[in-house]
A protein has these predicted regions:
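Core beta-strand-centered patch of the WYL/Sm-like small regulatory domain
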Residues: 1-82
Length: 82
């Protein structure tokens, strides 16, 4: 059964909502595009990150993959995609 966070992200994908969340102790602003599972069965999000912080050397905006179990403080926002 999908996690609560996965279900919230699924709704954001379906409704084309921007999301904000914390991942790896960094604030992120992104457009969620694809939800699925890794080869080992972990829930994963593929998103276009447009704001917030990112790993050293990564530029914004850009495509990112996040493990859903590492996403905290998830909120979605009304408004269209880019």
């Amino acid at each position: 059964m999908p996690s609560t966070t996965y279900r919230l992200l699924w709704r954001a994908v379906r409704e084309r909502r921007q999301v904000t969340f914390v991942s790896e102790r960094k604030h992120r602003e992104a457009y969620p595009v694809v939800l699925g599972y890794t080869a080992t069965g972990e829930e994963a999000l593929f998103a276009y990150q447009v704001g917030g912080h990112t790993s050293a050397g990564d530029k914004l905006p850009g495509w990112r993959c996040f493990y859903v179990n590492g996403i905290r403080e998830l909120t979605s926002h009304k408004g269209g995609w880019l």
